[in-house]
């Protein structure tokens, strides 16, 4: 499973092999993922195809600020939308996800397997993936659609009165509960045209297999994109890690708990920007990292940080191949007989990295609204 949370953080990082003491300012790409969950060959192939969407979506968000993003959360939402779409709209969604050569049933089964995989035997790692549809009590969703999203995505449909503020409160309460309070709300209000909100929530909490010693955390320089320097708490340890170095970047993997999940950090080489690095990175190369990494002693410095991001994804998803879901040409006839479209797709995400481990959460919401002709 790729990209539970992705972050681009500006920092003065140090990822050096053996006794090399060179420290340099640059920016890092971080990926929380799992390599050891069990899927069928078909499910694994479908999930791997979706990893291309994950990397491409993250690339649309690279700018001059630190970002945290969960492409997996967006993928679950898009999967539910694919089941409600028809015609060209459905084709666009599947192509954007990189699974246009896969049946919708196969896609659903892959997401079902991902949901089932969250029940691990690792007592040091918690992961929760949840889906939900909040619908106005006057809006009708087709029964077959409701049956599919419940059976394949565990997405219950909750009927609410969208004309009252209690509907907003209920939606935000669900978000807070599913993310253990990390994302307390996703929306402030509902418009008169809104008829439903499709939501995915992801929560991750993991303890490092090798925690950082708090006594080793020191205040050190932190350099951002604008080259300004500020002082931050920098964690430090020297230990055996899976490590790789090439002409573009260095990479190190930090496992959690019993190694089911891990964080991989990519640090551009001196003189290489994160934008230049990401141009050279695709899903296939990220996948090959784990095959090419070797165990060695790594002198690692990593900022102790908390960062959060709120982003509207309409433009990004449109550019990646699914513009029709956001305009009057949207076809969601497998979801409802009403003329509806996604007026807004937004995500809130947050990550906390400390000496003990990592907490990360994301909510992705698709606002379904009536098309006024």
Residue map of PLM features:
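Detector for small/aliphatic-rich hydrophobic stretches
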Residues: 2-162
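Soluble, non-membrane globular domain cores that form compact, hydrophobic packing
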Residues: 10-21, 139, 189, 254, ...
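General structural signal for secondary-structure boundaries
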Residues: 40, 70, 99-106, 236, ...
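Non-catalytic, conformational "gating/processing" segments within enzyme and secreted inhibitor domains
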Residues: 64, 104-269, 291-368
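Extracytoplasmic/secreted cell-surface and envelope-processing proteins
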Residues: 89-93, 273-275, 309-311
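Short Gly/aromatic-enriched secondary-structure transition segments
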Residues: 93-97, 212-221, 275-284
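Conserved small/polar residues in nucleotide/adenosyl-binding loops
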Residues: 371-373
């Amino acid at each position: 499973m790729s990209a539970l949370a992705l972050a681009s953080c500006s920092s003065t990082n140090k990822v050096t092999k053996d006794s090399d003491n060179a420290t340099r300012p640059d920016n890092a790409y971080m990926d929380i993922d799992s390599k050891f969950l069990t899927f069928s060959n078909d499910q694994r192939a479908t999930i791997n195809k979706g990893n291309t969407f994950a990397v491409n979506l993250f690339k649309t968000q690279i700018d001059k600020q630190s970002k945290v993003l969960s492409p997996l959360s967006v993928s679950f939402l898009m999967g539910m939308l694919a089941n409600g779409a028809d015609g060209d709209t459905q084709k666009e969604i599947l192509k954007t996800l990189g699974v246009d050569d896969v049946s919708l049933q196969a896609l659903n089964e892959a997401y079902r397997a991902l949901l089932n995989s969250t029940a691990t035997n690792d007592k040091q790692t918690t992961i929760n993936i949840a889906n939900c549809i909040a619908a106005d009590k006057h809006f009708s969703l087709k029964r077959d659609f409701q049956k599919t999203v419940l059976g394949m995505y565990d997405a219950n449909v909750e009927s609410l009165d969208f004309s009252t503020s209690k509907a907003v409160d209920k939606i935000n309460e669900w978000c807070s509960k599913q993310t253990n309070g990390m994302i307390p709300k996703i929306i402030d209000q509902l418009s008169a045209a809104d008829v439903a909100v499709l939501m995915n929530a992801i929560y991750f909490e993991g303890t490092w297999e090798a925690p950082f010693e708090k006594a080793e955390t020191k205040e050190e320089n932190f350099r951002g994109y604008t080259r300004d320097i500020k002082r931050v708490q920098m964690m430090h340890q020297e230990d055996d890690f899976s490590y790789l170095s090439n002409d573009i970047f260095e990479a190190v993997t930090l496992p959690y708990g019993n190694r089911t999940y891990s964080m991989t950090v990519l640090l551009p080489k001196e003189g290489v920007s994160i934008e230049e690095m990401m141009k050279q990175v695709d899903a296939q190369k990220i996948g090959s990292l784990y095959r090419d990494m070797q165990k060695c002693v790594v002198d690692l410095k990593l900022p102790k940080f908390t960062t959060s991001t709120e982003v509207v994804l309409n433009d990004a998803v449109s550019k990646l191949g699914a513009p029709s879901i956001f305009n009057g040409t949207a076809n969601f006839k497998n979801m409802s007989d009403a003329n509806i479209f996604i007026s807004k797709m937004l995500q809130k995400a947050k990550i906390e990295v400390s000496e003990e481990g990592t907490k990360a959460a994301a909510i992705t919401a698709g606002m379904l609204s009536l098309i006024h002709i």
